[in-house]
């Protein structure tokens, strides 16, 4: 009997045998019939309206159109058409999440507040003044609305801007670039679809290059030591709104209307350098209390929720009342129509 020679490991027969064995050992893989795509909600950018120049806050400029480099407008890039009115959709409350994590998150954010609060941001700025800061933020506010960004993004933008101003002198001709860079950094933290660099540069009418923006972004991140998650007015407004509803001090619809009005008041205060001395939690509770007063809420929010001195609360409330009185027309462009009617604000001119 002739003994067959052993098959060489590299022979075709051996390779075929290994393939058969491998196929027997592998588990069958069920292939998806259709590709799984992430569901995207439609985003509705807003068209900011020009406001009169006699208000205390600088005019909210119309969002500039695309530059000559052919960059598309924010509305087209985000896949939506502008809403007919200036109001954003009213948020919804998540009371179960608040019950589970609300107090822990509040205690953590409150402890961080002093570390992230920029004081005397313009003390080291020979070329940047409170007026130029007001003009820049009055331009950035409608830009953030045109992109359909959240109020949290705007608050983080202002915090990043002011904290950088406390560390580094900025030339006047680079101040606008710092503004859009701060907006980009904030949006990367919060937004699912942040604006593209090309879009932001187009808003500056081609005054800056992509390399300049990227270089300044690196400088800002290094100066701030990559600590970017600052507690904001937006966070504290949401916390106080949930707290009053959970405690049975207000109905959900009533609390949400007060929160929307308080956001409008807080948005006005962001552009005013006089309010940088107040912490975000103090501003949030005062804006909410003023909103309750304007809406004639039967059970206004308790000012003691924020654990602030009474003198500081009265001082901040007085300045906010004056701010709203001077900028009542500007405030109508930030609010839903039904809220303007309830608090007797002048109608928005379309």
UniProtKB/Swiss-Prot annotation:
GO terms for molecular function: cyclin-dependent protein serine/threonine kinase regulator activity. Keywords: Cell cycle, Cell division, Ciliopathy, Cilium biogenesis/degradation, Cyclin, Cytoplasm, Disease variant, Nucleus, Phosphoprotein, Primary ciliary dyskinesia. Residues 28-42 have a biased composition (Basic residues). It is found in: Cytoplasm; Nucleus, Nucleolus. Residues 1-89 are annotated as: Disordered. Present in respiratory cells (at protein level). InterPro entries: Cyclin, Cyclin-like_dom, Cyclin-like_sf, Cyclin_C-dom, Cyclin_N. Specifically required for generation of multiciliated cells, possibly by promoting a cell cycle state compatible with centriole amplification and maturation. Acts downstream of MCIDAS to promote mother centriole amplification and maturation in preparation for apical docking. It is linked to Ciliary dyskinesia, primary, 29: A disorder characterized by abnormalities of motile cilia. Respiratory infections leading to chronic inflammation and bronchiectasis are recurrent, due to defects in the respiratory cilia. CILD29 patients do not exhibit situs inversus, a congenital abnormality in which visceral organs are opposite to their normal positions (situs solitus) due to lateral transposition. Belongs to the cyclin family. This is Cyclin-O. The lineage of its organism: Eukaryota, Metazoa, Chordata, Craniata, Vertebrata.
């Amino acid at each position: 009997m002739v003994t067959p020679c052993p098959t060489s490991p590299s022979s075709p027969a051996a390779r075929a045998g290994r393939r058969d064995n491998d196929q027997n050992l592998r588990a069958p893989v069920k292939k998806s019939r259709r590709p799984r795509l992430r569901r995207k909600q439609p985003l509705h950018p807003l068209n900011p309206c020009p406001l009169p120049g006699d208000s205390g806050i600088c005019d909210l400029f119309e969002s500039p159109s695309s530059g000559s480099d052919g960059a598309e407008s924010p509305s087209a890039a985000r896949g939506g058409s502008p809403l007919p009115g200036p109001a954003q959709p009213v948020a919804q409350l998540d009371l179960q999440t608040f019950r589970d994590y609300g107090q822990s998150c509040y205690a953590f954010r409150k402890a961080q507040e002093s570390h992230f609060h920029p004081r005397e941001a313009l003390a080291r700025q020979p070329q940047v003044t409170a007026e130029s800061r007001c003009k820049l933020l009055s331009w950035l506010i409608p830009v953030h609305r045109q992109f359909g960004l959240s109020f949290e993004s705007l608050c983080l933008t202002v915090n990043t801007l002011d904290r950088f101003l406390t560390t580094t002198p900025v030339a006047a001709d680079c101040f606008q670039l710092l503004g859009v860079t701060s907006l980009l950094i904030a949006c990367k933290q919060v937004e699912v679809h942040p604006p593209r660099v090309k879009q932001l540069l187009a808003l500056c009418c081609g005054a800056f290059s992509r390399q300049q923006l990227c270089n300044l972004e690196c400088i800002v991140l290094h100066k701030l030591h990559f600590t970017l998650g600052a507690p904001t007015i937006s966070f504290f407004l949401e916390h106080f709104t949930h707290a009053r509803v959970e405690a049975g001090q207000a109905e959900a619809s009533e609390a949400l209307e007060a929160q929307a009005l308080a956001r409008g008041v807080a948005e006005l205060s962001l552009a005013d350098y006089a309010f940088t001395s107040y912490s975000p939690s103090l501003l949030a509770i005062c804006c909410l209390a003023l909103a309750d007063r304007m809406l004639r809420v039967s059970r206004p929010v308790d000012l003691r929720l924020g654990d602030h001195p009474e003198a500081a609360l009265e001082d901040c409330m007085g300045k906010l009342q004056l701010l709203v009185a001077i900028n009542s027309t500007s405030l109508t462009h930030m609010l839903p129509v039904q809220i303007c009617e309830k608090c007797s604000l002048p109608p928005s001119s379309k």
